[in-house]
Amino acid sequence: MKLRKYLFFYLFVAICIASLFTSCDEDDVIRSSEANITSFTFDTTVAANAAVLSQPVIDEANATITFKAEESGDVSALVPTIEVSAGATVTPASGSAVSFASGSATFTVVAEDGTSKVYTVSCNMSSLIQYDFETWATPEGAMYPEVVNPEGWATCNDAVALIKNMGPMFGGITYTGEYPVRQTTDAYSGSTAAMLESVDTQGGSILGQTIPKVTAGSMFLGTFNAMAAMSDPMATTEFGILYDKKPVKVLGYYKYTPGAEFYNAAGELQADRQDACAISAVLYEVESEDETLNGSTIYTSDKIVAMASFGTGETVAEYTPFELNLEYVKDYDASKTYKFAVIFSASADGAAYNAAVGSTLYIDDVTIENEVVAE
């Protein structure tokens, strides 16, 4: 009998304890108020997301998310992958097709406790201009038909053609070597790339104009003005093409080997100097289509609106990506007229006739990324 009383007593206590827990109302359970998007990405291997150029960047403080997409691409049914705070939900749901055709879309996150937060996701359209260096041809109006340049680019080949053709007659210079900028099958992708080599053009003068001991291999967006060669060599490089877009980035692939023997402008061997390659981009404003910056003014003019540069003196044996992010020193105004230059040189100080024989820069798959700006 006493054992039965104890059993009933313990059973009663157990029931009371259980009732304490089960009697708690669900509303008394602590629920999270976190309503954040912790990750927002696009799988660009999915066909629906092919237009996406950059992964989204989350600005938590302002509840905004931004990404870039190709101007000509389809953004009417992009499929984002979204992660949110534990226990929260998001609408539209992760994996759903969402239209960004209007430029933005909103996503609402609801926390466990019902707290909500609305994010605005903006799609900034960009346009791309790409150069693959597969097509080479003699420039229209070239003085010497043997000159071959990559499509869309000017090179120092025109200057070396002058040395080859005028040197023997007017300066006692006989240069029979390769042109500095050549098509090569050593490419990052496709069949060919551009090879820029600084070559030994002997030095001396032609009709009173100095010929460098080493001519730097160079390639640029712009025009080579052969008519200026005998009066002002720095004016031969007319940098920049008319540009109706706002460039923000220049990307591509390069590899580089500096030459062993460095010579100064006087043709003197400088055993203690090391060559380096240079890659730069310059956007500048013009009053007319004929206005241009040249070798003397391209980096110093007050017309410059944006610039970026990169260089290295290290040997880079394999194709390596480079990226120039333009830094704007003036506001971009779509109603104004601009020219844009991208410049590659196997010898960074080659314009001043300081370079190493054999410095070689390979360039392939160059892309200019432009922000779409309404007028």
Predicted segments — roles?
Residues D25-Y131:
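Beta-rich interaction/scaffold domains
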Residues A334, S347-N370:
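Extracellular carbohydrate recognition
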Residues S19-S23:
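C-terminal motif of bacterial Sec signal peptides marking the signal peptidase cleavage site
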Residues D200-E289:
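Extracellular-facing segments of soluble proteins and assemblies that are Gly/Ser/Thr-biased and enriched
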